[in-house]
Amino acid sequence: MNSPLSGKNWRLFLKSVACKCLVLFGIALFYRALLFSYSPRNALSNGSLIRARHMSDSSSTSGIRTDKFLEVPQIVWGLNNQKIAFARACLTARMMNRTLLMPSLSASLFYKELDKLRPIPFDKVFQFERFNSLCSGFVGLARFENVRNRAQVFDLEKGSGRRWTVERDLEQLKHFASNESIDEFEVIRVTGKNPFLWHDHWSVEDYAKVFECMVVVDEISREADRVVMKIREAGEAERAKLESKTKIPGPIPFVAVHMRIEIDWMIHCKKLEQRKKVSEICSSKREIMERVGNISGLKTPTVLYLAVADTLLEEKEENSSVLTGWRDGLIPFEKKKLGVKEEIYGKYSYLIQSAIDYEVCLRADIFVGNSFSTFSSLIVLERTQKARKLGLMSSCEDGENKWISYAYNLPGESIGVPRRWMTNMTHSSLQAISYGSNSVSCSSW
């Protein structure tokens, strides 16, 4: 009797149609998986696999290696672009499974204060240890003294120009992350353009995680507290004048308005409107005043803090002042009228002044800004995060919402009111926040 695995039976089995089909099907599956793994749509997934390869590194903390580093150029421009650039550098380091070496920020806008364009360490603006504690396992920050061998550096030059597409940029990052001979270098140093101008490969939620870890140093927080206290005190003084006429229960609301009407902004936004073929970027002083005054449910009296450019504080003519023209019950103040322009803001560089103003606007009961302003957009993003933590996923309905925000440059649900504004946390990139959008809504998803 022949064995079931005899040569004759085995040859007959190989010749069977079923076997051939199974073999062909297996080959097809193999090549499909191979092609799928190299498609651009799975580049970020590949990045995750690359990171996973390094997870067993003994110098790794929760998956992010602490013995391999990424170095980036000095970060420049305004506070808000610098925050975005820093977050983008962190996420780039995360993709390469490296710790970001603490970059230098810039103390001022280079085109406004050329003599003050000096580097300022990240930890003079944001808390270093707190950042690493809050972002542990997601991204990491290290000091240059953590580098053992400064001579062991590999330079990565960022591409530029129209031909340097998002896909090419992502392929470059994947290549450097997966190339073992390059990965052996202790430091990969990125050269070329500012991180704000790098291609964006990350979602709004990824950026939001980094922003949440960026807590300002105590000195900036205390100065913001002082400004807010001055605003509250000004409101109480106005209440005292009105109490003889009417009894007003509870604290007077504090509304922060990021009012962009200075000359250089108006020139920029007009050009932007022409290029984008839209008419909802620029807002006149009259339009801002009308829409803020028509906010639904706004109690009076209400204190307004006007976050404006310093050039607007020097207006001599009364009709051009940002303080005149508001409807009854709205009590406007700006830095100069509050008495904090020199006492508090004047002590610091442009960057620190912006950080203080950011914190003041963040703490307002209501915030009103321009959806094409990065400053406004980042404040709304942070207020959206705070609202979501309270279970508030939208601000579409009237009611108590501690973190409600509005865009005064966009029409709301009825004539003459601003649009309710929450950041859409489902966006796959930071495009709308970095460069502005007129497609904002009262929903965070």
Predicted segments, located by residue:
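A donor-sugar binding/catalytic signature common to diverse glycosyltransferases
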Residues: A87, S354-E400
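Donor nucleotide-activated moiety binding/catalytic core segment of transferases
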Residues: K8-L12, D328-R363
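Secretory-pathway glycan-assembly enzymes, especially type II membrane glycosyltransferases
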Residues: L22-A28, A43-C282, I295-L298, A307
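Catalytic donor nucleotide-activated moiety binding site of glycosyltransferases and closely related
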Residues: G293, K299-K347
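Leloir-type glycosyltransferase catalytic cores
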Residues: V17, L134, S394-W445
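Well-ordered, non-membrane alpha-helical segments in soluble/globular domains
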Residues: R275-V292, E318-L323
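Eukaryotic short linear interaction motifs
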Residues: L109-Y111, I263-I267, L312-E315, S376-S377, ...
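N-terminal signal-anchor transmembrane helix specifying type II single-pass membrane topology
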Residues: N2-H54
